[in-house]
């Protein structure tokens, strides 16, 4: 009995200690990392309500090995966010999507953070590695070592400097929405009142005018989506033949689009008709794209430049489907300026002065998205009149001279007929690559820009070429240049291919990549256009 009483006393003591620990308030909350959480974190409403619905302007996050990180707390769309300084914390601890964070409130505005991996086991960190702080210092947010200090005054002054650095970083980020470290920008990177993860996502280097922001936010509030919306502003590369396409930010695609190349479904609000464009996932993990029936969607919905599309993922569906809301932009020539707004979707601020004057009128849906591309289109590829440049052209040519109007028209028609998911590689037959002649045979050189993205860089790979129902095995040779990178050539086996298909100087070969594991390409041949007159 005595032992039982002792056990009960210990249990009561533990309960009392736990209740005192709680202090009548909730102490902990758990968050699982998603793609949107890498740049800001939404705190649970129930947890915030236990603090009177208000969290101080800045809080301190203590990492598992005692280093403090100062993070700004903001309120957006009735949500409480950890924002400025949060990304530095994530980067310093290499926190990945699928991992979990357990926040425990210690005192005042200080929280202890336990980091769990995707298997729900605690992650172990090297104290020396994190205290070095190089990753964090690159982000201009200095860690504060609270594990031990010879002087309390030194620690306090260090924390003061930390807060000053945070304030400076936040102020500069609010003034400029450029150069977001995330690779693409959530809207609050440009306008802090719009939260990431709970509102919408813009592609990299995309800026909305005030009129666009207001219309987009209003429409999103009207439809109240439960999932983050992707916003795109239509440009020439999204609309014009031969192969219009829409670029999707890789981080957004990693959450809401298929993990590999696949067909998705698009539909309009309250409409029965559906479209099935092909979502192409690029090998290099940069921005991905919609092609194929995207052209049908553009045509059927009469999309024009400056129209805004909002892609709302369908919740809970097995297939990847999106409801697309449209905000139409109608060009006006009105001189009195009534209800005219400048809503340029320029990729940088110096282009904002050239923004078109347009009326915006609401369509039966709302849609926002804009893409930009860091990969410029050189003279090797199909030229675009869009100054922003497509992130990926319909085809890439290895020719140094520009195509004539007849050549360009013929190649574009062929590319459109092929309907490839990825760009076509276009090569022209030279004296050293044709089937005739006794000169030195060098083989056919492919576009290095195309090959660097879509072909292996290992030397002496076997490439299977298909043409008119027949198959040839070609040796793919990669030659390294000391100053200009690599060059790709089709050598052994190419002469037979050229002979069997009666290739002559000036003929065009369009290479369509069919398989990547067993490297296979379909070859479409266009005879020398100079033999035919330029007549319709």
Swiss-Prot record:
Compartment annotation: Nucleus
Ranges annotated as biased composition (Low complexity): 145-160, 171-183
SUPFAM superfamilies documented for this protein: DNA-binding pseudobarrel domain
Record keywords: DNA-binding, Nucleus, Repeat, Transcription, Transcription regulation
Any one GO MF annotation of this record: DNA binding
One GO CC term, this protein: nucleus
Biased composition (Basic and acidic residues): 372-382
DNA-binding interval(s): 26-119, 231-330, 429-529
Xref: PANTHER family: B3 DOMAIN-CONTAINING PROTEIN OS03G0619800 (PTHR31391:SF23), B3 DOMAIN-CONTAINING PROTEIN OS11G0197600-RELATED (PTHR31391)
Name the UniProt record assigns to this protein: B3 domain-containing protein Os03g0619800
